[in-house]
Design a protein with these regions (language model features):
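NTP/phosphate- and nucleic-acid-binding module
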Residues: 1-104, 110-647
Length: 647
């Protein structure tokens, strides 16, 4: 009988008959290794590092030499297996409770999983509770999970007999002659695996929500019911995650936007937020802050059209690649596109004048509104919208200026994130994808420039090979928030295609014409999305300089209302955004309401303060000593100064 060599984590190598399962090989070696025995008791899968590295079922037979290790449930690979198996567990419970339901797909996602079902009447919260109860019953049954490979035609026959038409459609689209099925008790599913050895390994899970989803993500197809869940290796991990979820609900920018009267969303304009006066003030103050940086970093602001003939996007290359995400309009037998990005218009703007190398770099900044068609099912508050503005800019420079421009952008990004206390930044370099525009040589030069700039900045960088945009490599700055979520904020990309497509040029010192380098860059990205992230990061307690109401005066009684009103006027004259609560409510009520509205500075005014021309400040719920009004205003003005000293 043929034999294979298996090397274990401790470096030892043993020989086994071909076809020995991963579990058998691990158990045999564990008999001589106490540490491996303990690891194997908790293992839910195995990791191989042979000709085809993979995480596999413990029961999977081995037919080639490999390295082999157990996979612990709390490891990243183990959590993926747990969550995938819990998705199957949920589907089995749904089929037990609702036999007429058809199953579709159930992948792993960040922190959990989902499964899509066809059930026209949908699922209620009561249904989810019953499904979860049935899942726990199946866990107690500790059903063995078995893998089987069958001919594609046989798999089609089986699923057709079960009435699982979506599975039949999936299998018919697979290129392989054989497919793998997984079975636990009466439940069978099409799956590549791997999975836990038995359902008894799945103890820490919770179903979290249900939502609509279209089959294959296409709105033209039938709507399905998507049940989301989460699964963890330990119950304490699950409880910690659920606590974070509850915290996320309290920090949800949609809830805060309504509670703080910042913005609202309405069906009349899907994906296009209404910014209320307070929200517009936050929005415009952000723009003012970025404009103050533009003045220091040498940007010139431009205003470009909102609607262009689609010839522009055909020339830029966006029409073929981005058309499905555009709002297109037919007028006077011409096709127009509502602007989804600024870069083609900035190329046209650059071409309106002849440029010398002495003119470069040229840095165009643009806060124009952009519109992109996002499917209705993907819209999410301010995070995913159809109407937005960005702190968008495009730089046209010579090749010799490229490194310096990237470093200047990184410096500006550092300054902005420091202003908001965003200190957990991870940097990625995204390189040439399979489908790209422009010459390979331009891509290589651009990627090298980005690498050099990052090396000089001192950031630790993760390279994401093949994940650049179709027109150029990209640096992304990912911010990890208080809820451990990662958000891509700043991006800088070198365009390897558009300058040539628009035949852009500048006169060199030798008098010849050369193509400029074009850089796309944004620090905040979408202003709408940045506001959402900032609200959730701060739980609505915006920095003093950005708060829509910076100071609220609270008179104790009507006797001092006139003084409170005069104090507000003095605050406003000094540039503070101040107001007074002149209602006849009790002081405690007014203080509590101001705290709920996240007012940064509260100042109480009683008869003693009015007589002395003073106020009694309160911050973070704590009372401070009374201050003369002028001193209070001076201190607050200094604290409310915009970062970087801008006014």
């Amino acid at each position: 009988m043929a034999e294979i060599s298996v090397t274990f984590e401790d470096g030892a190598t043993e020989r086994f008959p071909a076809g020995t399962s991963a579990a058998e090989a691990l158990r045999a070696h564990a008999a001589r290794n106490g540490a491996l025995q303990r690891a194997l008791k908790r293992a839910i899968a195995a990791r191989t590092d042979g000709s085809e590295p993979a995480v596999i079922d413990l029961a999977r037979p081995l037919f080639a030499d490999c390295r082999l290790a157990p996979v612990a449930p709390e490891s990243p690979e183990g959590l993926s297996v747990l969550r995938h198996s819990t998705a199957h567990l949920m589907a089995q419970a749904v089929k037990r409770l609702f036999p007429q339901v058809e199953i579709t797909i159930g992948p792993v996602i960040e922190n959990g999983f989902y499964y899509d079902f066809r059930r026209p009447e949908g699922f209620t919260p009561e249904d989810l509770a019953r499904i979860e109860e049935t899942m726990r019953a199946i866990v107690r049954e500790d059903l063995a999970v078995a893998r089987e490979e069958v001919a594609r035609a046989e798999a089609i026959r089986r699923f057709r007999a079960m009435g699982e038409h979506y599975k039949v459609e999936i299998i018919e689209g697979l290129p392989d002659d054989r497919v793998s099925l997984y079975q636990q008790g009466e439940f069978v599913d099409l799956c590549r695996g791997p999975h836990v050895p038995s359902t008894g390994h799945l103890a820490a899970f919770r179903l979290t929500s249900v939502a609509g989803a279209y089959w294959r993500g296409d709105a033209r197809n039938e709507q399905l019911q998507r049940i989301y869940g989460t699964a963890w290796a330990r119950k304490e991990d699950l409880e910690a995650y659920l606590a974070r979820l509850e915290e996320a609900k309290q920090r949800d920018h949609r809830r805060l936007g309504q509670a703080l009267d910042l913005f609202s969303l309405h069906p009349i304009a899907p994906g296009s937020p209404f910014f209320h006066p307070k929200g517009a003030l936050v929005y415009n103050t952000l723009v003012q802050y970025i404009r103050s940086l533009y003045a220091r970093y040498g940007y010139t602001e431009v205003i470009t059209p909102l609607i262009y003939k689609t010839e522009l996007y055909k020339q830029s290359g966006h029409y073929d690649l981005f058309r499905e995400d555009m709002f297109l309009i037919a007028v006077e037998e011409e096709e127009y596109g509502v602007k989804p990005m600024n870069c083609p218009g900035h190329c046209y703007l650059f071409a309106t004048r002849k440029h010398s190398y002495r003119d470069l770099p040229i840095r165009y900044a643009d806060f124009s509104r952009l519109h992109r068609f996002e499917a209705s099912g993907t819209l999410a508050g301010l995070v995913r919208v159809r109407s937005m503005a960005q702190d968008d800019a495009h730089i046209f420079c010579t090749p010799d200026q490229l490194d310096d421009e990237i470093e200047r952008f990184v410096a500006m990004t550092r300054e902005v994130y420091a202003a908001f206390g965003f200190d957990r930044i991870e940097v990625t370099l995204q390189t040439r994808p399979e489908k790209f525009l422009g010459a390979v040589e331009r891509w290589d030069t651009a990627e090298a420039a980005l690498r050099r700039a990052l090396e000089r900045t001192g950031f630790a960088v993760t390279v994401l090979a093949g994940q650049g945009a179709f027109y150029g490599p990209k640096i992304g700055f990912d911010f990890r928030d208080v809820l451990e979520r990662s958000w891509t904020l700043a991006t800088v990309q070198i365009d390897c295609a558009m300058p040539e497509r628009f035949e852009l040029g500048y006169v060199t010192p030798e008098g010849s014409t050369a193509t400029p380098v074009m850089i796309h860059r944004a620090v905040l990205g979408s202003l709408e999305r940045f506001i959402a992230i900032l609200l959730e990061q701060t739980a609505g307690k915006l920095p003093l300089w950005l708060a829509p109401v910076q100071v609220r005066l609270l008179p104790i009684s009507e006797k001092v209302a006139d003084y409170a009103a005069r104090a507000v006027d003095a605050c406003r004259a000094a540039g503070l955004r101040a107001e007074a609560d002149l209602r006849g409510e009790k002081l405690g009520y007014k203080v509590r309401e101001a705290q709920l509205e996240k007012i940064p500075v509260i100042a109480v005014v009683g008869e003693r303060e009015a007589a002395a021309g003073a106020v009694a400040p309160r911050r973070e719920g704590a009372a401070e000593a009374a201050l003369p009004l002028d001193d209070f205003i001076a201190r607050t003005v200094a604290e409310a100064r915009m970062p970087g000293g801008a006014s």
